[in-house]
């Protein structure tokens, strides 16, 4: 790895407008832990669209994305891969 540190940031996805700031942080090669509960409680369909958008963005940038239980999603830069066991859901 490079001499630059990789930062870990926890964010809450409250609204579809938060997706752009999450993408900006992902472009900075941060590891992001995104709490999705507030949006899930408001509008599950909008949450699905937001997650699909983030999934496509992260994959096209060479990063990785996975669920962390029911309440969180983790996003990693290209240099960090997420181990997904056989029982993990996509």
What are the residue ranges of the model-derived segments?
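Anion (oxyanion) recognition and catalysis
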Residues: 26-27, 59
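Helix-rich interaction surfaces within compact, conserved domain-sized segments
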Residues: 57-90
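Short hinge/gating elements
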Residues: 34-41
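Ordered, soluble secondary-structure elements with a strong preference for glycine-centered loop motifs
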Residues: 12-16, 41-48
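N-terminal intrinsically disordered, cationic/polar leader segments
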Residues: 1-26
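Residue-level signature of catalytic and energy-coupling elements of molecular machines
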Residues: 54
């Amino acid at each position: 790895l490079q001499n630059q540190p990789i930062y870990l940031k926890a964010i809450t996805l409250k609204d579809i407008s938060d997706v752009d700031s999450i993408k900006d942080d992902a472009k900075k090669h941060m590891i992001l832990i995104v709490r999705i509960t507030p949006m899930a409680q408001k509008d599950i369909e909008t949450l699905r669209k937001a997650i699909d958008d983030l999934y496509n963005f992260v994959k096209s940038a060479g990063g990785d994305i996975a669920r962390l239980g029911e309440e969180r999603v983790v996003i990693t830069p290209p240099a960090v891969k997420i181990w997904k066991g056989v029982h993990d859901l996509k």
